[in-house]
Regions:
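Polytopic transmembrane helical bundles with strong interfacial aromatic enrichment
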Residues: 1-132
Length: 132
């Protein structure tokens, strides 16, 4: 369980990098008013996969250590809720990807930006809670 905890904590910068790629490639297609290309689709898919795995590891960790958190449980639950919404934003992207036009690329970009903003908010919340 400790290994999962370390992996969950250390993956933050990888998540930021993948989110940036998941934003930049669709943004390029949006600015060119084109549908999403293969590279953009793969960037979104990889980010979706990694953030989903990260969320599942976090939920597993929350369930396994439920009684150990004490007063910090509130922050852990807020973090989990924010990350759930971020994962929800990412999983709404295929709905717009299937459109196959520039509007789908734009909406996918908006969802990726919203997801990154929520990930930053959730990570900041849990880091501030750990500091006291």
């Amino acid at each position: 369980m400790e290994t999962l905890s370390v992996i969950h904590a250390k993956m933050l910068h990888v998540i930021y990098l993948l989110a940036a790629l998941g934003i930049v490639f669709p943004l390029i297609n949006t600015l060119r008013k084109q549908p999403l290309h293969t590279v953009s689709l793969w960037a979104v898919r990889v980010y979706t996969f990694v953030i989903t795995i990260q969320f599942l590891i976090g939920i597993l960790q929350l369930a396994a250590r439920w009684g150990d958190y004490g007063d910090g449980l509130r922050y852990r639950l807020e973090h989990a809720l924010i990350m759930f919404i971020a994962v929800g934003c990412v999983h709404m992207a295929p709905r717009f990807i299937k459109r196959g036009d520039a509007i789908g690329a734009r909406n996918t970009t908006f969802l990726m930006v919203a997801s990154l903003a929520l990930v930053i908010l959730g990570a900041t919340l849990i880091q501030r809670a750990a500091q006291g």
